[in-house]
Each structure stands twice: as structure tokens, then as C-alpha cells.
Amino acid sequence: MQGNFSKKIDPMSNLPFTVAALYCFAPLPQYESLREPLAQLCCANGIKGTLLLAAEGINGTVAGSAGAIEKLIAHITAIPGLGEPELKYSHASEMPFHRMKVRLKREIVTMGVEGIDPLKSVGTYIAPKDWNALIADENTVVVDKRNDYEYAIGTFEGAIDPQTRTFREFPEWVKQNRDRLEGKKIAMFCTGGIRCEKATAFVKGLGFDDVYHLKGGILKYLEEVPREQSMWNGECFVFDERVAVGHGLAESDVELCRACRRPLTPQDKLSQFFEEGVSCAGCYAERTPEDRARYAERQKQVKLAEKRGANKHIGS
């Protein structure tokens, strides 16, 4: 499956599915009432993916035909008080999602810290073309705002890995590492930008002034910055069946461990602990023999379903 990102839906794309990654922070006191109309619109138009609604706004990634996605974006943009979301389009040869979910949440991206409002205070946005100069500055601390399994398959040169498993762990990491950040320019990045909205707001709230984040995230950087000028190494994990993308947003050969959902490079699959659908080096010790036996049976059913031509995502 191929994929590429752009600011607008490309009418010349020969790929049948348009993928829209979007978010918008805005006061939405009526967010619960928005769920059903969104779900109905998506169902009626063959759109799949996930949309999260909360009192602080909307976040999600969805896929469908170009016309269907245009209808959805028009509907979202017309929601009173919301306005135009931060939006990135891509195209794919296969549907990258299995189903459609519209969920009500406390936060559209969960950090678990009360009072963080990106509408009031965030870091300075840095365009992809200016990012290299910032992170090459010896007075800049570069912080990968993603989780450890995302960092493991790709990151920027010199970036710190906070070794977090979830976004909720980031505030504690900052508090424990203040000495590494004091007196420095702090440059943060994440996949598409939304986690950095809250992360930079949080860090600024602790009294740090020189706080920056990559506008449009890694995806926009990989789209706009030529490979020969790039300071990115590896692949960028994405939260759908494409798994990861590289420079130019070309799909990579990274796959998912279907037992734990960690990304696996071809080298990872050479591990003695890797068994397709059952375990990988990252999760083998976390599972009991009973767990692995259950996963093995599930994998067997997946393979049987594939032979019958049934949905290939059974058990995934």
C-alpha cells in the first residue's frame, strides 16, 4: 500500500483512498451531541478510522473516497465554535482502517494534567524548512515527544528519548529532567503535531521560555524536506495499517507485532522470540505460555480466514 501526504486532496492521485489526519483545539461544550451525526455521516459514506471528541476539541484520522472525505471535512468545519482544523491529506491504495469509531473522551490527546490549554499558551511553531537549523544549534535540546516504540524505528539526529510508554508519563519525565532543559532551547516533535501542542504548553507552564515545536510534525517534515537535506533517521510510525512511512512518505517495510502492536523492522523479525501473530522480542517476556498459545490459535484462524478470502484483519 502506497501513501503520500499533501495540504489538499490531490484530484490526480491514482490511489483510491484519501486519508485525512486532523485536529482542532476549540471549546466544544456540546461535544456529546456531535457524536451521532458524525458517526452517521461516516457510515453512510464508507469512511473508516477514528474520531475523538472532547470538550477541548476534535482529533482523529479517517479514510475514504475523496468525495466522502470532503463531505466529512465540510461537516466538521461547520461545527459551531470549531473552525478549520489542522489538516493533512494522504492517499493509499488500500483502506488503512478496519472500522469507524467516534468516541467521547476527556481529552482529544491524553496527557492527564488539568488546566493545560493550548489555546492560551504553546511553544513557537517551527516550519520544516527551518527545523534543521534549530536542532543543529548546540544550545538546543531536542526531545522526541513520542513513545518508546515509535522512537525505536526512527527519530531526528541527537534527539532525546524520554522512554515513555504513554503520553501521560511525559510530565513526570520533564520534572525529573529539568536540569537537562534549564538554559536551553527546547525543541519538541511528534508525528503530526498534536502531542506537542499540549507538551509545549505544559513545559511553558513550568517557566521555560525558549520552547519550540515542529509545525505539522514529522509527517510534514518528511513530505517537504528532501532526503539529502534531512536530519531524520529511520521510519516514522503511523497509527494505521501502513505502520510506518519514510522520506517522501513512502511506505516502509516495517510491520506490526499482532500480539503487542509494537512496530517490527525486518531485523526485529530475525529474533528467536519472533513468531508471527504470537510474540516478538519486545513482548515475549510479558506474556505467559497460555497467552502465546491463545495467540497462536488466533493466528491459525487468521491464516484460515485469509485462505477463504475472508477479512484479513480477523484478530488483528
From Swiss-Prot:
Keyword tRNA processing included in the entry's annotation: yes
Start and end residues of each Rhodanese domain: 136-230
Keyword annotations: Oxidoreductase, tRNA processing
PROSITE patterns: RHODANESE_3
Family that this chain belongs to: Belongs to the TrhO family.
InterPro entries per UniProt: Rhodanese-like_dom (IPR001763), Rhodanese-like_dom_sf (IPR036873), TrhO (IPR020936), TRHO_N (IPR040503)
A GO biological process held by the record: tRNA modification
Protein name: tRNA uridine(34) hydroxylase
PANTHER family: RHODANESE-LIKE DOMAIN-CONTAINING PROTEIN 7-RELATED, THIOSULFATE SULFURTRANSFERASE/RHODANESE-LIKE DOMAIN-CONTAINING PROTEIN 2
Molecular functions per Gene Ontology: oxidoreductase activity, acting on paired donors, with incorporation or reduction of molecular oxygen
Superkingdom of the organism of origin: Bacteria
Catalytic activity: uridine(34) in tRNA + AH2 + O2 = 5-hydroxyuridine(34) in tRNA + A + H2O
